[in-house]
Amino acid sequence: MNEITFYPTYTKVSNYEKGSNTYIERSLSVWDKATFSYTFEGYRIDEDGNLYIPGGFDKGVIENNFKNHTVRDLRVDYFDIPRKNEGIEMKFKPRDEIQEKSLQFLADSKYDMDAYQKFLSLKTGQGKTFCAVSYVSFSKRIPMIFVHNKNLADQWFERILDFTNLEKENVYLISGSKSVDKLYKMSKDERADIKFYIAIHATIDSLYKKDSNFISELFNKLDISVKIFDEAHLRWENILNVDFNTNCRSIYLTATEGRSDPAEDRVYKSIFKMAPKFSDNSRKIKEKPKRYHNVVIYKYKSNPDPEFMAAFMSKSARRGFNINFYTEYITTQRFKEFYEPLKKFILKAVYPESMGYIRKTMILVKQVELLERLYEELSNDLFGRNITIAKKHSKMTKSEKEENDIEKADLIITTDSSMGTGSDIKGLEMVISTIPTSSDIVTTQILGRLRYIENMNVYFVDYVDISFDKCKKQLSSRINKVYKKHALTIKEL
């Protein structure tokens, strides 16, 4: 029987001989006039005479070109996932409407057959990586992220750790055959701890050429349920090899929606024609100023003693600034030095008598222990001033959560990881971040937590300990890489 069968990311046509339908073949091939030959063919024919066509190619065109074939659509059979990817929590919410609508696009139409392939095209810096990681978190799918070089793989590795609650052991890099051998030797329980797989195209391509069953066997072994292709305008051949050999959905990411060469661009657009697409121009994004944050840099000194500095340098020797060790030091040894300038600022900026109202504010800290101590001290010192204080963190009991209504509170104290959960806080006018970080991506996402409010100034306060050279260097990096690019004003106190 002659059949056309639709799968999530490819279409299979049975009983096909090469050259029997030149229209389909030419539509998916790049012809080089200089060498008088095809340099790329976006289809495959296996030894059993099955033609494989990209899932994004126009299905109406396929049916019209094979009218004597019966049609079967098996895409819905692959909707369910083999194993849920539990326990991934985002530290941050989408920072703007572009990220919000990008995530809506990735989540929408989950029962729509065309939703198995989605194309997200955002400019560099608009948050493709963040959106992809967020999608994995809420969809609970086990991803394999494909990149074309080690530098990109390292960037993904860092961003996953920046954006989520995961540790290094929860992310696995597939680079070289030895990394695959190591995976296969792991027990099922060991692999269960891996939440993200990042694969180098060259490694997958090399092993696939040695064994045509490699890709499908790898995906089945790891329970992969979503493919994410970064820089999807590159490495076409391997992208198609992966799509032709797997039956889970694909997300294609790129800042470049097309190819510069006209012949290549024609084929590129044919391959992804039916895949739903979203870019910053796809839907109407509400007009708002690109710069609306007023950044205030508030410096203080914790004055560490030589004994602590020696211990801190030792703890920070291997992985850089040890933020947990530093935060414990602030909580247990230098809380007064940390707290008094902060309290003074809060009384002046959050509750200024001249304003006649309280400025809704969020304070970000790194650890729950520091949060609890700060909450207790502020509750005592601000008692009787008609300021409602609430806290939010992962260790709160059910009764504590009920008692702390952050929507109604004037002053909210939370951790960076807890900040990423829940809905946006309406009317938030100020964020005070006490978290040392050198990551411009993390800083940008935290900055984005403060939304534009029409006819109102909003403030982002960078509360920084200048007793540490590393903290000063981090601040300099944040100023140059983030604040100068995104802030309306920058003021140092």
Language model features with spans:
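Conserved helix-turn-beta segment of the N-terminal RecA-like "Helicase ATP-binding" lobe
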Residues: L152-K178, D381-G384
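Conserved interdomain linker/interface between the two RecA-like ATPase lobes of SF2 helicase motors
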Residues: K277-T361
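Conserved helicase ATPase core of P-loop NTP-dependent helicases/translocases
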Residues: D181-S187, R373, N386-S417
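Walker A/P-loop
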Residues: D112-Y135
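Post-DEXD/H (motif II) to motif III coupling segment of the RecA-like Helicase ATP-binding lobe
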Residues: V226, E231-Y292
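Conserved SF2 helicase motif VI
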Residues: S438-N457
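Conserved Walker A/P-loop ATP-binding site and its immediately adjacent core
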Residues: F130-C131, F138-F163, K366-L371
